[in-house]
Amino acid sequence: KYLVQQLPACHTVLYYPLCMAVMVLWPMFLWPATHGMPDAFGLTFAAVIALLCADYRFETLPWPRLLAIFAATFALILTRRWYMFWILAFYAVYVLAVLVGAVRRKTLGSTLKHMLLFSVPSAVIIVGALLPTFKTILTTDYADIYGAYYGGGFGNNCLGQLRTQGLIWLVLCAAGLVWLLYCRSTRAQAIVAAAASLGAMVLFTRTQSLGDHQSLILAPFYLLMLFGLCAKLTQQKAKPWLRNAAAGVLAVFLVVNFGNALRLPGKNVQTLALSSESLDLTRRTDLAQMRAVTDFVLEHCTEDQTVYINMDSNGYSGTTFAYSDPAHPQLQTMILWESSVPSTHGFPTGIWTSEYVMVTDRVDEGGIVGPINAALRIQSPAAVHYEYVTEFPLDGITLYCYRRTARPDAEEADYFKQVFAEYDARWPEIFSQRIDEYMQSVQ
C-alpha cells in the first residue's frame, strides 16, 4: 500500500493479488515455513521496521511510532540470530540516509539530537535485556563452529542465490529495482533496501553461507523490488489489454515456479531459470522398510532406552526414523539425533549409552558418520563391545543393528581419540574432553 501511494496510480484490483501471490508462491519463503522454522515469522517484524522508517526522518519524536520500531527490532533479534546482520546493515544505511537528508535540509542539529534521544536508550535497553545473547554472539567463533557448512564467501553465495531464486526471479527483481530507482518518490527507499541487503549479505557470508532459511535476510529487498514491479505492470495509464497480459504473465511465472518446487514426479525440471528450492510433498515409497526399523525399536526397547542410528545419506538420518511414525511419538526420544558435523555435534556418546547402535557400510563417508560406521563394521577396539543382531535393507543402503554388550574401556576411548584426532585438535571440548568426562562418569 505504501508503494501505491508513492508511485503512479496502479490498478489495485490487480496489484494487491499479485503482491500476495509473490509472497505465498515464493519457494524460499515457504521452505522454512513448511519446516517449522520461525524465519518467515521474523519477516513480519522486518516489514514493520522498514515501513515505519520509510518516511520518517527524525524531524520530530513521535513516540508511538518509535516504540513500535523499538518493539519490532527487539522481536526480530529474538526470532533468529542472522536477522541481526540485516538489522545492523539496515540501520547503518538508514541513519546515513537520514543524516545526508538532514544536511541537505540544513536540519542536521535537530535531527541528530532526536536520533540520539531515541537510539541511545533503545540500544541500552536491548543490549541490557539480551546481554546473554550478545555475549554469546561476541565470544563465539561462528566461522569455526559453522566451518563445515561454509560454502565460500560473497561471490559463491551470489551464485547460490542464482540457483536458489532462479534467473527469472532475479531478472524480475532487477527490473523492479530499476523502476523504483527511476521514480524519485521511491529512489531513497530502493537504495536503502538494496544497500541494507548487500551489507547484511557481506557481513553474514564472512562466516557462514546463506542456506534455505538464512537467505530470508534478503527477503525485504526481494519483496520490495517485486512489489515495485507489480506496481509498474498494473499502472492505470497502461492499455487494459497490456496491463492484464503483463499481470497474467507474472502470475503464470509465479505459479510455475511454485509448482516446480513441489517436485511432483515427472512434473518438474532442473533449470537455472526457476528456483532450486524443494517443497517435496510426495509420499516416501520406503515407509514399510522404515517401519521394520521402528517396529524393532518399539519391540526391543523400553521408552527410557535409546537407539543410535548412525546415518546421514540416501535420504535417511536418525531423525528420519524418529519422526516417521506419528502414532508412536515416543520414538522421537528413543531414537537419538545422529551426530554428523564435527564442528557442532562432536563425539557421539550416544553410541555408548544406547541399547542398540545401527550403522551402514559407508565407512568412507565424511564427518563423524563414516568413522563410527568403520568402528563397528571392522575389527576395532570398539567393535568387541558390540554384537550383531540383525539388518534392515532400505532404499539403496543396508542398516546393520548391533547391541551394546559392555561399557567402554580405556582402550576404546583411546581408539576414538585417535580416530578423531584431527577434529580434536580444533574442538577438544567436544571430542577428547567429552570422552574423558564420560569415562569418569561411568567409573
Enumerate the predicted regions with their spans.
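Transmembrane-helix signature of polytopic, membrane-embedded enzymes
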Residues: 1-25, 44, 189
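Transmembrane alpha-helices and membrane-interface helical segments
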Residues: 2, 44-56, 87-99, 172-180, ...
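Membrane-interface transmembrane helices that cradle and orient dolichyl/undecaprenyl
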Residues: 9-11, 47-66, 76, 183-185, ...
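Membrane-interface alpha helices of multi-pass inner-membrane proteins
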Residues: 19-21, 65-81, 91-92, 198-202
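Transmembrane alpha-helical segments
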Residues: 26, 83, 246-288
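Short acidic/glycine- and proline-prone juxtamembrane loop motifs at membrane-interface regions
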Residues: 28-41, 211-212
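Transmembrane-lumen/periplasm boundary regions of multi-pass, lipid-linked membrane glycan transferases
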Residues: 87-97, 102-103, 111-185, 198-208
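C-terminal luminal/periplasmic domains and tails of membrane-associated envelope-modifying transferases
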Residues: 279-309, 314, 323-443
